[in-house]
Amino acid sequence: MSKEKFERAKPHVNVGTIGHVDHGKTTLTAALTKVSAARFGSAAQDYDQIDGAPEERARGITISTSHVEYESPLRHYAHVDCPGHADYVKNMITGAAQMDGAILVCSAADGPMPQTREHILLSRQVGVPYIIVFLNKADMVDDAELLELVEMEVRELLNEYDFPGDDTPIVVGSALKALEGDTSEIGIPAIEKLVDALDASIPEPKRDIDKPFLMPIEDVFSISGRGTVVTGRVERGVVKVGDELEIVGLRDTAKTTCTGVEMFRKLLDQGQAGDNVGVLLRGTKREEVERGQVLAKPGTITPHTKFESEVYVLSKEEGGRHTPFFKGYRPQFYFRTTDVTGECVLPEGVEMVMPGDNVKMIVQLIHPIAMDEGLRFAIREGGRTVGAGVVAKIIE
């Protein structure tokens, strides 16, 4: 199969299906590709192709994920679907597949179930900004009042986790009927309506290059007669010669100025998101800056030591721990380019955490790290990854 050239004409948005097992996430994913293929000539994928998700490794964790693509009149969507609940948990926590918005699939026949709640909570914790609801299996419900009841329950659940439940678009349909080519209201038109809801309700994501400048520092050199150079890969934004910058994390925040940007030994007037660059700093001594700090636009990021996180603990099979850990556990937390020791505070009533579990915990680091909510990290013991996490809420 030849790969067509990736069309940049339409803006690119990342979405994914979430929801309880057997509520129809994969069937809906297949229906979305089919309906879009009929409208725009993109590729349709059937259920089995999507369900046979290949395993990927993200930060040393094995995750099964299916990636499909489809078009709307306005956009190009990249869509992730996971076969198992554990894959969702890992995917969302590691950020392996970042979502600009999620499609919550809930069976109209069953209403919200435990994983419906858990996926909404996870979406809140890992910073999925928007949720759109597809009430599936509407062909199995002939009672309009029951549909209304399920819709109300889903809205209440969204409100409970600080999503705007009352204003969330809810589309009622049957993914299976749409796949079968049904043109009644709950068939193909429902899928088209869902795509329109994605277009209308998920704002176009801000590109990394448009965000404020940030570069994790990987290395520091001193160049005689020119000053100190820090190197790293620009995470977001743009840095230009003459920009005032801050060095954040591990020690007191320091101010500096960029007097040069170089890439592959060539001087540039700027470095941007994705570039591996060296940034020459004026008035900063070699010993005043170290790996693990970040270089950033002043006032855009601050150092913190205490935060609430959502963590996935690797199973033994994934190369993680063989035994549980308890409160007071003190591993290394690896942020961007460096390890910092921290202590884990487990939630009330949780005595221990088993390999393969996911848990909400508070972490207290011994040194401050430049962070904002949504930052991913690894948990390590002696250089071996034993967990993955995301900063859900900064405490201090």
From Swiss-Prot:
PROSITE patterns: G_TR_1, G_TR_2. It is found in: Cytoplasm. Gene3D superfamilies: P-loop containing nucleotide triphosphate hydrolases, Translation factors. Its main location: cytoplasm. Residues 19-26 are annotated as: G1. It catalyses: GTP + H2O = GDP + phosphate + H(+). Mg(2+) binds at residue 26. SUPFAM superfamilies: EF-Tu/eEF-1alpha/eIF2-gamma C-terminal domain, P-loop containing nucleoside triphosphate hydrolases, Translation proteins. Residues 136-139 are annotated as: G4. GTP binds at residues 19-26, 81-85, 136-139. Its EC number is 3.6.5.3. It is an enzyme of class 3 (hydrolase). Residues 60-64 are annotated as: G2. The keyword Membrane does not apply. Residues 174-176 are annotated as: G5. One of its GO terms (molecular function) is GTPase activity. Residues 10-206 form the tr-type G domain. One of its GO terms (cellular component) is cytosol. Residues 81-84 are annotated as: G3. GTP hydrolase that promotes the GTP-dependent binding of aminoacyl-tRNA to the A-site of ribosomes during protein biosynthesis. Monomer. This is Elongation factor Tu. It comes from Dichelobacter nodosus (strain VCS1703A). The gene is tuf.
